[in-house]
Each structure stands twice: as C-alpha cells, then as structure tokens.
C-alpha cells in the first residue's frame, strides 16, 4: 500500500488530496480538501492572478493539515503537485510547498500535469482507466485525446482553435447578466428554457472542417448579436438563449467525441474537466454513447472541478506504471502541453 498526497494550485482552487494505491492497482480516495478563492474574484469578473496566488499561500497550510487528519496520516509515502499548465504565480505556491514537504519528509516528488489529473479523477469511482477517447473540457482548455493508459504519453486528436468551452460559458453568462463564474448559473437557467427555440451555429461542424477541432468564438458572437437584436422583443427570454447556447456546445462536443471513439475503434469515452459537470453535456453524451455502443465514464461533478484528489490519483497511476520521481529542481511550466503527463 502506497499513500500519495496531491497538491493543486493552478488557478483559484487550493486543493490537497490523498490517495491510497493498493498492490492490485486500485486507487482509493482518503482525503479531499478544497478551498476556493472564487468569491474574491467575482467583482472583477474573472480570476485575478495576484489574488489567487495570495489565497493559495493562506489556504494551503490549513488544507494540508485537514487532509492529513482526515486520512489518519502523519505523512504520505509520495508527494505530487500540479507543475502546469496554469497561472504562473499560483503554480509556484503549490510546487514550492510540495518540494518542501518532499524534502522535509524524505519522500519522492512527482511533478504532474493538471490536465492529466482531470482524466485520472475518474479512477476513484470507476476503477482503472482502459484505453479510451477523452474529451477534456474546462474553463481554459478543450481537447479531444486518445489515452492508451494514464502511464503512457497522451495523443492529442484535436483542440479548440479559439475559446475553450468553459471560457465561452463564462462570457455568455456575463452577457446574460448571470455574473462570474457563469457555468453553473447558465446551466441552471438553461434547464428552464426551450433548447429548440433558438438554434445557434455549431462551429467547425461542416464537412470541410477538421473532424476533431472545436471553435466557440463564432457561437459566442452569435449569442451577442441575438441579444443585441432581440433584447427589446416582448417575448425575449434569457432562459431560451441559455438553453440554445448550451445545446450548441453540448451537440458539437459530444458529436466529435463519439465520432472519434467510433473511428478509432475505442469502446470507452471519458469526459473530464470542469465543464463535464454540465447537466446537458452529461445527458447528451449518455444518449449518444448508448446509440453508438460506447461506454461512457464521467466523474461525479465534485471530482470534475479542480482538486488535489485528482493530482494524487494521477501520480498514483504514474507510480503504478513504474515512472521514476521528478527531480526537486524541476521548474513549473504555465504552458505545459496536455501530451506531457509528468515533468522529470
């Protein structure tokens, strides 16, 4: 049995999670502590890097103590941290702390990819991840990936050419007066609307477009133009706009993800990242995977957002695959590509 502590500080959530790796490869969640600074960013309409970094400094120590107490440990066998991608200052807080704990405890350090952590979070609820196509959707990233195993290099099939899906959600939510962060507020509003009342364009979905690339900038612009043109109409309903926008996003994401799994002959589709908590995306993915004969895996909403548990899970998978630790002088990398799971 090996215990792995994961630290996540890539954006505005301070996460400390602890996982247990058993000899048979099973990964069990022992502790998951998250402190968010989102309320401090609301008045700015987005994450302010300096505020996020200071919040991590204040929250990390208490979160560490709570996680160790919850797991019943004095120290773990391994320490891991998000090395990138993310906000430079925020990453430095978590990486510096993880290296210090690693040195003080005399345990190995693993520098892992934040995005790989999102993929790994699913193992807590559904067991070891088989070969799969993964749709990774969050506030800053939208990728379609071929994952043979979490211990091997990840193959990128496609990504967004402009806005990430989560970024589009936040911008449209702001346009509709829903505030920041907008993902959940827009999802809740969309449930009360008619998703067929307004049909918004599906970017990069034509026969000449890249089969696995995404674009949400045009959709965002279409929503803005619709609001500008119809705001004075007697029947103007923001719920219908939200529902139509959400349907356009979920339609393209699930269509391309299922298409990739079918084309590659891969039986499992994994959806991960913060946007994976969206109700319509989960519903439509379930429907389309059923029609295509694919197995769908999506973590519970609480594991879709940023947390330390996912970093612990990813590091545990690397340990199980025989990956060596990272050196303590490895630098953080705000632009780390999704294909590189570990920096060493």
From Swiss-Prot:
It catalyses: L-threonylcarbamoyladenylate + adenosine(37) in tRNA = N(6)-L-threonylcarbamoyladenosine(37) in tRNA + AMP + H(+). Substrate binds at residues 136-140, 170, 183, 187, 278. One of its GO terms (cellular component) is cytoplasm. Its EC number is 2.3.1.234. Its main location: cytoplasm. Fe cation binds at residues 114, 118, 306. Keywords: Acyltransferase, Cytoplasm, Iron, Metal-binding, Transferase, tRNA processing. InterPro entries: ATPase_NBD, Gcp-like_dom, KAE1/TsaD, Peptidase_M22_CS, TsaD. Its cofactor is Fe(2+). It is found in: Cytoplasm. NCBIfam families: gcp_kae1, T6A_TsaD_YgjD. Belongs to the KAE1 / TsaD family. This is tRNA N6-adenosine threonylcarbamoyltransferase. It comes from Mycobacterium tuberculosis (strain ATCC 25618 / H37Rv). The lineage of its organism: Bacteria, Bacillati, Actinomycetota, Actinomycetes, Mycobacteriales.
């Amino acid at each position: 049995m090996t215990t792995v502590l994961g630290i996540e500080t890539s954006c505005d959530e301070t996460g400390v999670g602890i996982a247990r790796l058993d000899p048979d490869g099973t990964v069990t969640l022992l502790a998951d502590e998250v402190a968010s600074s989102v309320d401090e960013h609301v008045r700015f309409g987005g994450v302010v890097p300096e505020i996020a970094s200071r919040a991590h400094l204040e929250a990390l120590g208490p979160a560490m103590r709570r996680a160790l107490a919850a797991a019943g440990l004095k120290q773990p066998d391994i320490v891991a941290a998000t090395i990138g991608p993310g906000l430079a200052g925020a990453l430095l807080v978590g990486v510096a702390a993880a290296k210090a704990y690693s040195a003080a405890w005399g345990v190995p350090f693993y520098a892992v990819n934040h995005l790989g952590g999102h993929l790994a979070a699913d193992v807590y609820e559904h067991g070891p991840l088989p070969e799969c196509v993964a749709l990774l959707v969050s506030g800053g990233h939208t990728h379609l990936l071929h994952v043979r195993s979490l211990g091997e290099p990840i193959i990128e099939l496609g990504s967004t050419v402009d806005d990430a899906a989560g970024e589009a959600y936040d911008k449209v939510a702001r346009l509709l007066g829903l505030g920041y962060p907008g993902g959940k507020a827009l999802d809740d509003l969309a449930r009360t609307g008619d998703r067929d009342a307004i049909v918004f364009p599906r970017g990069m979905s034509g026969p000449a477009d890249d089969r696995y690339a995404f674009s949400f900038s045009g959709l965002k612009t279409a929503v803005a133009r619709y609001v500008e043109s119809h705001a004075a109409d007697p029947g103007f309903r923001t719920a219908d706009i939200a529902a139509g926008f959400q349907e356009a996003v979920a339609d393209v994401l699930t269509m391309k993800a299922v298409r990739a799994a079918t084309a590659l002959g891969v039986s499992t589709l994994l959806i991960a990242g913060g946007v994976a908590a969206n109700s319509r995306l989960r519903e439509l993915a379930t429907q389309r995977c059923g029609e295509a004969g694919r197995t769908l895996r999506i973590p519970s909403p609480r594991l879709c957002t940023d947390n330390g548990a996912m970093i612990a899970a990813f590091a545990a998978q690397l340990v199980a695959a025989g990956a060596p630790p990272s050196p303590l002088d490895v630098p953080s990398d705000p632009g780390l590509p999704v294909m590189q799971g570990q920096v060493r």
